[in-house]
Amino acid sequence: MNKLFNIVFIAALTFSACSKIPVVELPITTSSPKALEFYKKAMLSEQVGDGFEKRQYLDSALALDLNFVMALEMYGSQDPIKLREQREMAKSLQNTVTDAEQLMLNIRNAYRDGNMDHALENAKKLVENYSDTYESYVWLGQVQSDRYELDDAIKTLKKSIELNPDSYEAYSLLMGHHIAAGTQVMLPEEKRDIELGVKYSDELIRIRGDHGFPYHFKANVYRQLGEFEKAKPLYEKSIEKRKGLSSEATAYLVSGHNFMFGGDLKTARERYAKAIKLTKTPNGWFNLNYYLLVSYMFDNDYIGAIEHIDKIEQALESKDFDEVSLLGRKATIHWQKMVCYAHNQMEEDAYSALEQGSIFGEKRADRKSVV
């Protein structure tokens, strides 16, 4: 029997681990209870940067329910063709799911279209229609943060925490207002509070102390302050907690940053090499090699940097890149070569690398338009 059902996590079934407060979650539509279990595990993996595991769980969910809209939407394939196909399929099935899911899809599509007014409109509707769910406030807080409406975002995210003291995403966004975290929008410098950021990081560790990412996040605070020795044990804890996971590579990567900025380039490169060895995807392999390249540039060793780029280039064909991605990587490599040659006063080689990079870039654009 494959009757469609909606799972709404009502207060009687879900409680905050912190204070036993009943927690209401947004409804998710699927034809399979087991698929929903996999989906929830996938979202927990995404929460802490385990993209590979997230996609594995979503593969399992989609094997049970091919039309699982939110699983299709949240999959995030690294294959651009598969990514587009899954997003288009999710969009085509949008009318088959709950109003809450439609609003979430609208928000994500608005981001892709660069229409932040539409994103805000839908996020506000989500809160209006599902004001008893902590997740709706996370969605709105994210949009408000990205619109630089930070005072509103802080109030919204604190409301999420009122409804669920274990709202990991809310604490993560609040911390990111004070501590640099990727591309997250931060408060103006005069309003940032390092101590408050550390307090939020401790909440992340309390909620997800089973995983290394919160330790990594807190270590970043000390690294950014130049307190490299204070950051080291937290990075080591992050590595320990991520053993066997795809994000173990990330743990070694950020630890490498700490050693590099602390002046220990030898250990930094050992950490970067370990991260590269552990990565599970072609994109991960390529991106992590970039940081090893930067370690040579950081040391003004442009010959060493060029030799490293040559090694990456030789290995590219053996990696499982699709054609468009491979051309893009080749274009990037030649741009990197150009920078290194230019810094080393090798003008002819720099121009040659620039020309080759342009050729690969044009080929990628042509191929992408066909695909």
Protein language model regions, located:
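Acidic, proline/glycine-rich low-complexity intrinsically disordered segments
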Residues: 18-171, 176, 198, 210-211
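TPR alpha-solenoid repeat register
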Residues: 71, 136, 170, 214, ...
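Conserved small/polar residues in nucleotide/adenosyl-binding loops
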Residues: 370-371
